[in-house]
Design a protein with these regions (language model features):
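Acidic/charged, solvent-exposed loop-and-adjacent secondary-structure segments enriched in E/D, K/R, S/T
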Residues: 270-297
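The canonical Cys-X-X-Cys-His
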Residues: 113-123, 154-164
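Mature N-terminal segment immediately following signal peptide/propeptide cleavage
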Residues: 77-114, 118, 198-225
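Signal peptide processing junction and immediate N-terminal pro/mature segment
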Residues: 24-52, 56-69
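Gly/Pro-enriched, hydrophobic low-complexity segments
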Residues: 254-257, 318-415
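N-terminal secretory signal peptides that target proteins for export/translocation
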Residues: 1-11
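N-terminal mature ectodomain segment of secretory-pathway/periplasmic proteins
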Residues: 203-276, 306-313
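Primarily the internal scaffold of c-type cytochrome electron-transfer domains
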Residues: 66-67, 71, 75-77, 85, ...
Length: 417
């Protein structure tokens, strides 16, 4: 996943900013200042001075009914903390879960190649000129989608900005005649003529990792290694706990406090010392994504995890041919999976979560497969979202060990160090 050069320069100029981006919400949220991070870690569920740009939903017919319509359109689950409960000065994006709110912030950051404080004041509540302009742009995007696409999120910030603060008007000829830039399609696709049958690709994958019988005998594993955050410079210890068929917990012991990502088979959470909500409930597409991540850890049930499987024509990643499959989760969110044509192993997953301003992508690239109890397990993967990336490298994996049920329970709020 390519990150804008301006954004990279900002990150690598200081280890603090690099760390904050690295521990941004797995939902795709933006980073935050140390002042705001410390306040959120001690304030529990009290409102914090975040005051981020408050975008409207693309399919929303008007701003006056913003709160009620947001809840109705997203089917916001009961009991989860909403954006206006967590943050101050939320003017538009009310009635939606915090993880969707943060995913939308991440989309703004990715589209403009900007970090938080390039739009926000240090206290995050003030209406800066860029925030005011952004609200006008949101209304413009909503009008375009409502007028031309029946409210569907066809046009987004990324459509025009592409990591620039101002959309280009005139095509530069050195770009027109230069090396073409390939943008992977993020739309749903149908079964392509001439593409392999999805079951054929999935069966080869199951066989490549060791076969159904060996997968059934691998009931759990515990991995240990290191995690490198976006920007580099240091590595943090990491622990991964997996229990078949669909429980997974990852703990990254970061310098300023642990980050814990857990899926217990039904619900998912993120706990971090430097996020605006100490323990974030995963909802919607982010919950579907956490479920897929857990199932892929011991992938014996992959065919059943996603439905409506279809195959596109083969593509390539890093010079290797890959088969491209797409499936849809029960919640309606989709994921695209890339399998190495020669080995049959899973190379990449790109999964999507709907948000107020479009789909929030999460990309996981797998490598360094090694046998664990007869099953090939990736010992290296990168986990990238719209405002950060972790690269995890395992040094040891212990198979079929007893794991306490508490490892998959809702994590306690992280304690800042």
């Amino acid at each position: 996943m390519q990150i804008g050069s301006k954004r990279m320069r900002l990150v690598v100029t200081g280890a603090t900013i690099a760390w904050l981006i690295g521990v941004a919400l797995v939902a795709g949220g933006t980073g935050m200042s140390i002042r705001a991070a410390a306040a959120s870690a001690t304030a529990s569920n009290k409102k914090v001075g975040w005051g981020a740009v408050q975008p409207a939903r693309c399919d929303r017919p008007g701003f006056a009914q913003a709160g009620a319509q947001a809840a109705a359109q997203t089917g916001a689950p009961q009991g989860h903390q909403m954006s206006e409960e967590a943050f101050k000065n939320v003017q538009v994006l009310k009635g939606i879960p915090v993880d969707e709110f943060m995913g939308t912030m991440g989309l703004f950051s990715a589209a403009l190649s900007m970090c938080c404080l390039e739009c926000h004041a240090p206290d995050y509540t003030a209406d800066t000129p860029r925030k005011v302009t952004t609200r006008r742009m949101i209304e413009m995007v909503n009008t375009i989608n409502r007028t031309n696409f029946s409210g569907r999120k066809v046009v987004s910030c990324w459509t025009c900005h592409r990591q620039m603060d101002r959309p280009a008007v005139t095509p530069p000829l050195d770009v027109v005649y230069g090396e073409p830039t390939y943008w992977a399609p993020d739309d749903l696709f149908q079964q392509a003529k001439g593409a392999p049958a999805p079951n054929q690709v999935l069966d080869k994958y199951i066989q490549a990792v060791g076969g159904a019988e060996r997968l059934a005998r691998l009931t759990s594993f515990v991995g240990k290694g290191t995690a490198s955050l976006f920007g580099g410079g240091f590595k943090s210890p990491v622990e991964v706990y997996v229990k078949a068929p669909n429980q997974r917990t990852t703990i990254i012991h970061q310098e300023l406090g642990d980050k814990t990502m857990t899926f217990d088979g039904r619900a998912g959470w993120l706990a971090s010392a430097v996020t605006p909500v100490p323990v974030l409930d995963l909802t919607g597409g982010e919950l579907d994504g956490a479920r897929l991540d857990a199932e892929l850890s011991i992938p014996g049930r992959l065919k059943q995890v996603l439905g409506q499987w279809r195959a596109n024509l083969p593509s390539s990643i890093a010079g290797r041919d890959v088969n491209v499959l797409q499936g849809t989760a029960a919640g309606g969110n989709h994921a695209t999976l890339y399998f190495d044509v020669e080995s049959g192993l899973l190379t990449r997953v790109v999964r999507y979560a709907n948000s107020a301003m479009g789909r929030v992508p999460t990309q996981i690239d797998f490598g360094d497969y090694r046998e664990v109890a007869g099953v090939k397990v990736p010992f290296r993967w990168s986990f990238a979202w719209v405002s950060g990336r972790d690269v995890i490298e395992l040094s040891e994996v212990q198979p079929n060990v007893a794991i306490a049920a508490t490892r998959f329970a809702k994590p306690a709020p992280a304690i800042p160090r």
